[in-house]
Curated annotation (Swiss-Prot):
Protein name: Endonuclease IV
Entry EC number(s): 3.1.21.9
Function: Cleaves single-stranded DNA in a dC-specific manner. The cleavage occurs exclusively at the 5'-proximal position (dC1) within a dCs tract having a minimal size of 6 bases. These specific cleavages may have a detrimental effect on the replication of host dC-containing DNA.
First-level EC class: hydrolase
Keywords, ordered alphabetically: Endonuclease, Hydrolase, Nuclease
Length: 185
């Protein structure tokens, strides 16, 4: 089926872009701090500096996508019992059909993008990008995954690697010969 949704069509046009620390706004910094705090609360054994860096890279991608779709970033009060409060990252402007977009970043040097749905769902017990929010909860309408690469100290390049809906995503997930799942793209 040909995808004709204006929001999805707009996402397909998203360019490669870069982030420098000087591009961060106060709003982004608040979301980075909140996201890092939540992650560390879930798993206190993580390295705080690594968590903040991971969140910085991910949050900037969310804000770029929100700007691209003339929408806004989900920054409400997440309620773990209500996926409508957390299982999407960006809400597009009505001219882009109000798409709810899940934004993910592949932040390793690995050629393969490992994926999982957590402890349950279609692709359980792996590691890598968590597809649970889009596949298990079915709140987000589509997903965009960026490859990220540090091109200079403090400067990250984002390249769109996958854009699609749940149906498109399921077509590219493969079982690894070793452990878990990966995207065949």
């Amino acid at each position: 089926m040909q995808k004709t949704n204006p929001g999805l069509q707009r996402l397909f046009q998203i360019p490669t872009f870069t982030l420098s620390n000087s591009d961060l706004t106060c709003e982004m910094k608040v979301k980075i701090a909140d996201t890092a705090r939540y992650s560390l609360k879930q798993n206190p054994n993580q390295d705080k500096a690594e968590v903040i860096e991971r969140c910085r890279i991910a949050v900037y991608a969310e804000f770029f996508v929100a700007d691209w779709l003339s929408g806004y970033v989900n920054k409400g009060q997440e309620d773990v019992d209500d996926p409508y409060t957390y299982a999407w990252d960006v809400l597009a402007h009505p001219k882009y059909c109000g798409l709810r977009v899940e934004v993910k970043t592949h932040q390793t040097d690995s050629r393969w993008i490992s994926v999982t749905t957590g402890c349950s769902g279609e692709y359980p017990y792996g590691s890598g990008i968590n597809l649970g929010p889009i596949l298990n909860h079915q709140v987000a309408d589509c997903i965009i995954i960026f490859n990220t690469k540090e091109i200079h100290p403090g400067v990250i390049q984002y390249t769109p690697k996958f854009i699609g809906d749940r149906e498109d995503l399921r077509k590219v997930v493969r079982k690894s010969n070793y452990n878990g799942w990966y995207l065949s793209i």
